[in-house]
Amino acid sequence: MKRYKFYSLIVLALCFFSCESDFLETPPQDRFTDELYWKTEANVQTFAYGFYPNYFTGYGSGFTWGSYFSGQTLNDDFGPSNPSRFIQQVPTSGGGWSFAWVRKANIFINRVQTVPMDQEAIDHWTGVGRLFRGLEYHGLVNRFGDVPYFDEELSEVDNDQLYKSRDDRTFVMDKVLEDFQFAAENVRENVASEGLMVDRNVVLGFMSRVFLFEGTWQKYHENNPAKAMEYLEAAKWAAEQVINSGEFSLGNYREVFNSLSLSGNPEVLLYREYEPGMLTHSLNSYNNKEPQTGPSKDAIESYLADDGLPIGISSQYQGDRGIENVMANRDPRIYETFVSDELRINGVHSNYSTTGYATHKFLNEEIADLPEGSSNLNPTDAPVLRYGEILINYAEATAELATLGGSELTQEDLDMSVNVLRNRPGINLPDLQVIGGLPAVNGQVYDDPARDSDVPAMLWEIRRERRIELMMEGFRLDDLRRWKKLEYVDMVDNPDINRGAWVDIDDYPGANLTNLALTEGDQGYIIPAPAGTPRIFDNERVYLNPIPLDQIVLYRDQGYTLEQNPGW
């Protein structure tokens, strides 16, 4: 049976202490009181499950698909017909400025200490609680930068704490690092969950993700190389622990994303399980018979040729006139991710793509024509944390450390990370080599003519590897943010993100192509968003979200000050 689908509902029923019930002199008979609940490890485990749907969303539920595929399109990978845009105004309320999950984690950590368990169990569950607190604070810092830090359950009358000023993001992330270090030391190495519960490797995997983000943010935004090195070392160490565990390996690329069951998949550290009639999603449907937001020309051109060279210098590249040429002799991950034998054009196909290039990374062909392959009935399992990400986290952290004066990136580093990805069964792309600090393939040093001149050549190739390996998995916007490269999503300065496949209308006689805009009239590259104002990046304030007005007013009304983010 499924492990945690309904646990959030169970926890809501059990966590009575979020409600006011002081008016009752006699404890309620139909539910636990706080004092009675925290008596067994089983109850602790049940409470912990309440965190899972919030942090391990997978493909979401119903008519959603989480951050996968087009769940996050404000980046340079997608060519939507109506492009997502940066926040333009300070919200009146909401906006993600909430500390409810911090409070929940602090309550959990506090109560675990009171449960009659042995010390190993107390330390394990404390580590689990500190993982969730760390993840929540990472999310808050990611969105807002400086935030008030709380590591204890607060009284509702302690205004000096409730309305405290924002703490510096470095102070907060140092606390988050302490949480992850404790969790890595104390969370159990093995739990009988087959990838459905938090264990030490899950902690380490998230640690590599969180501190790769924060280390690069400190480098590119805060100009703090010492703190950048500390966090990047933490990311590298965590990834290396997972690698050295020997517990994970790579199999078929696409099976990680379109399988009815991920149980036993050697690449998956943590996944969310789906079952018809219990918990389903709609991601498979939007890779199946529905119109979809397609990948940009820029994204398609980021895939290497099969000789391991960028298309701008590879003799293997056949050009972009026709899908057969675009897809010839490419990094095989392009075939695992995108439909390679046809363009899907608006006016020709009912399941058209806005760019002509269609995605099938998440499509399970076995259920494509069954009821569960359509609508919001999709039961394919969702990877939450996978080994492929851990490998590229290791490579990027190591390469970034080298730019900060750390140890040089070695061939051994590449062979235990990037080249494991390239030697995945069914991929078999030539190894990436480092020669004199520069990228090389088969002994040939090269420099991509499309490289951003601000980015060193080797780091450019590792970032490319990350983009390709994690394509459409919801990472790209945060990657551009932490690298301080949001200019890549500017449709004026980077028009190829608002371009799709090359099309000649004469190739589609009788088709109604009136909704198809092309760069050269009756032929040219598809323009997914031909009308309206193009998306631009013209203000660095959007690297952080604004704090909602109601929170600033609330602080002021209580006699305190909550500072707004710069530029808002």
Where are the regions that the model predicts?
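An aromatic- and glycine-enriched ligand-binding surface/loop that stacks and positions planar moieties
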Residues: E20-G79, V147, Q181-F182, M197-T354, ...
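Long, intrinsically disordered, low-complexity segments
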Residues: C19-E20, S98-W101, K175, L260-L309, ...
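Bacterial Sec-dependent N-terminal signal peptides
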Residues: M1-Q29
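Conserved, well-structured interaction surfaces
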Residues: E41-T57, N75-F144, D160-D174, E178-G195, ...
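Amphipathic alpha-helical protein-interaction segments enriched in hydrophobic
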Residues: L196-V210, A382-I390, F475-R481, K485
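Alpha-helical scaffold segments in carbohydrate-active enzymes
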Residues: G50-N54, V128-L140, F182, F206-F213, ...
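Acidic, serine/threonine/proline-rich low-complexity intrinsically disordered regions
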Residues: E153-L154, L162-R166, G205, Q218-K236, ...
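Short coil/turn linking the two alpha-helices of tandem helical-hairpin repeats
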Residues: V141-N142, D146-P148, V191, F213-E222, ...
